[in-house]
């Protein structure tokens, strides 16, 4: 839906890519203006963008990594398809999307697990039209270890709404 079109700031995308250091093949399912895609250093990279006729939900090729800011209204559907075709999935989204239901938790557990939750402050700090807490969720196929919790902002500046002060 049009409300799902929230472009990721390039500065945010670069920080996320630098943090996770994806190797191998990589897919950006919601390319938009290319904040993630244009900064992937991987040679084997691909993209989807529904507005350009490349529907991610029809993409079937296996990839090593997916890193994206998914459409929030179809979050579960997007995650389910991502888990089918990738070994490592990183979603940049409101963090409450992840822990909303037992059904979703069971799907994640059958895939592997959440390796890391990276808190990145509020949506407004990253150009999102809301102030909910946002961050990255890193899902890894077959993972059964502890979940790491990371903060990607300066804790002493918590509450400041400037992205420059955090990244």
Residue ranges of predicted features:
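Class I S-adenosyl-L-methionine-dependent methyltransferase catalytic core
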Residues: 1-167
